């Protein structure tokens, strides 16, 4: 599992590690790891290094000595010659690096202007060099993080560098995993410098293909039956949006619950049972609900009905417009950016600029887990701890995919998983199913549902491959 930590957490871990090794040794670890990561860079015979003040620039300068030893030509652009890392500059120059006034279009660019301690945004010469990168498009590698990003907030609305590759040290940062900042990082490579024993619990985690053990809690007991596996209630669709009911049920069928109860109009219930005879269209006890996908005029009543059962509930789509002020039962809210904007009474653009901030605000406001759907779906607990999904394909931006996701996660909830774990695993497996359904090409929501059972089996067996989005190296 990938994990990310805040700047404060990283600073404390670095202090503890440096107390054991010394700061010089720690910088040398980072420098060597950076140089090794640069060995296969396109146009790697020449590199221009944008050198800022402090340790970030020092890491790059010491890495330059390794590159020079390997026959690479290194040009140094000093952002502030009076504040440059003196020992690093001396070592680079003694090995053959040359100082130049401005970057050129030769080779690739190493962004070492600012690290994790800097404020978001760039000014003056740093902003000019970032604009030069945007204009000239050299292959750009960021040292630890691209300069100008909001590291802890994972935003990128101020002036910043956009990198093709980010070589980050010790642990991932929120900005390297969460959009929109992550989109400015390109591919991300982690260099181990020994921080692990000194890091606290992460604020962000990412499920990976080999994390199948996380789903073991949802496996059926050998002596169990359909009721012990869990019953999920589906209240989805309407006469106008009948397809949402079918797709939500299809997602639930692909999950881990032993039985599905469907609640809807008589006409819709007949359609659902006619298509899926395993479904029971009668009220009865359930262990979890999925409510709202394609809902009609009765959705407010269905919200009340589901909450009255005092079992975990997933609220999607139109159900999000009828939420009480808080909950006393486990709840998972699954908005997209527009729905979250409506819930919080802000513009959609505000959510898209700072999705993590707004997802955390909603989780705290409703004391519920929030799954914010997007290219990198976020799952956020009320305490702010977060899971980021990196599986999937842009082809999953298709009608009905969210209905399948709601039913599938509802099934996981009915098995006993928490809203956070059900949302995190559900998003990951749903994304993987989108890839498996038609690798590299378009998929329909029904095809995603059909692919899910085999994806779940592969996940449990540790055999999932090719599920990653770009930017996850």
Residue ranges and their predicted role:
Residues 1-76, 165, 174-317, 321-332, ...:
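Small-residue (G/A/S/T)-rich helix-start motifs and N-terminal tracts that mark the onset
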Residues 35-113, 121-143:
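Nucleotide and nucleotide-moiety/phosphate-recognizing core
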Residues 84, 125, 159, 400, ...:
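Short acidic-hydrophobic sequence patches enriched in Asp/Glu that either
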Residues 92, 152, 466-467:
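Intrinsically disordered, low-complexity, compositionally biased regions/tails
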Residues 103-107, 160, 283, 307:
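A short, aliphatic-rich alpha-helical micro-motif
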Residues 106-108, 113-205:
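Internal gly/pro-rich beta-alpha loop/helix module
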């Amino acid at each position: 599992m990938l994990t990310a930590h805040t700047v404060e957490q990283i600073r404390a871990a670095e202090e503890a590690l440096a107390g054991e090794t010394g700061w010089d040794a720690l910088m040398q670890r980072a420098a060597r790891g950076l140089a090794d990561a640069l060995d296969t860079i396109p146009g790697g015979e020449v590199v221009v290094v944008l050198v800022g003040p402090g340790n970030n620039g020092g890491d790059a300068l010491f890495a330059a000595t390794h590159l020079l030893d390997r026959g690479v030509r290194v040009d140094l652009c000093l952002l502030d010659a009076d504040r440059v890392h003196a020992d690093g500059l001396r070592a680079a120059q003694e090995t053959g690096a040359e100082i130049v006034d401005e970057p050129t279009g030769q080779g690739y660019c190493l962004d070492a202007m600012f690290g994790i301690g800097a404020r978001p945004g760039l000014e003056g010469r740093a902003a000019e060099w970032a604009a030069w990168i945007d204009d000239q498009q050299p292959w750009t590698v960021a040292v630890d993080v691209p300069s100008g990003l909001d590291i802890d907030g994972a935003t990128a609305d101020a002036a910043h560098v956009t990198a093709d590759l980010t070589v980050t040290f010790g642990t991932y940062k929120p900005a390297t995993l969460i959009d929109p900042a992550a989109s400015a990082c390109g591919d991300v490579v982690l260099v181990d410098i020994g921080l692990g024993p000194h890091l606290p619990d992460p604020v962000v985690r990412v499920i990976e293909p080999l994390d199948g053990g996380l789903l073991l809690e949802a496996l059926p007991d050998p002596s169990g039956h359909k009721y012990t596996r869990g019953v999920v209630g589906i209240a989805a669709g309407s006469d106008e949006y009948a397809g949402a009911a079918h797709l939500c049920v299809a997602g639930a069928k692909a999950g881990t619950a032993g039985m599905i109860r469907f609640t809807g109009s008589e006409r819709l219930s007949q359609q659902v049972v006619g298509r899926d005879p395993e479904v029971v269209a009668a009220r009865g006890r359930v262990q979890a609900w999925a409510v709202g996908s394609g809902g009609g005029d009765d959705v407010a009543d269905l919200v009340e009905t589901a909450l009255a059962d005092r079992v975990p509930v997933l609220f999607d789509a139109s159900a999000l417009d009828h939420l009480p002020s808080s909950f006393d039962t486990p709840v998972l809210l699954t908005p997209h950016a527009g729905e979250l904007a409506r819930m919080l009474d802000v513009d959609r653009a505000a959510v898209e600029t700072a999705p993590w901030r707004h997802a955390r605000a909603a989780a705290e406001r409703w004391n519920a887990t929030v799954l914010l759907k997007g290219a990198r779906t976020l799952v956020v607990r009320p305490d702010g701890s977060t899971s980021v999904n990196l599986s999937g394909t842009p082809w999953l931006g298709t009608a009905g995919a969210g209905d399948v996701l709601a039913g599938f996660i509802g099934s996981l909830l009915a098995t006993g998983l928490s809203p956070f774990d059900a949302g995190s695993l559900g998003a990951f497996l749903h994304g993987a199913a989108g890839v498996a359904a038609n690798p590299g090409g378009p998929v329909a929501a029904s095809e995603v549902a059909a692919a899910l059972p085999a994806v779940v089996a592969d996940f449990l067996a540790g055999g999932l491959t090719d599920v990653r989005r770009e930017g996850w190296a």
